[in-house]
Amino acid sequence: LQGKRVGFAAVSPLLHEKAELMAGLTLTNRILGFVNPPVVGQHIMAAALGSQVDLGIYAARRKAMGEVLKNAGYEFQMPAGAFYFFPKAPGGDDVAFVNRLVEERILAVPGTGFGCPGHFRLAFCVDEKVIRNAADGFAKARAAFK
């Protein structure tokens, strides 16, 4: 269930800016979609508790993504505890570079949205074959920003 998070917001009854907070939370929900888990999702999470995941699959995907990025000349650190990479965006403009990746049919997210301008985020939770098939696209996008 990677990417699924459960939480809550606790607000002091003494907060004077309640209306502004609610407006901000409402806007966040509209932009991000449902950030609160629906009832069906809560039941799925409860049923999944105690399940085992073959972490070897993710290790192989991480290794594949690292090889693809290294061979294409990207600067990055191997992730140790997450299922995504944050390579440096060639040319420094993460938004422009992510748009170039789209031309290669590669989905990435600008690092600016995560407080890491000049980087981009790539998830490796897709099949290893998908990662390896993207190698040419990563190389072409990188070459366009030398």
Label the predicted regions.
Residues 1-146:
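PLP-dependent class I/II
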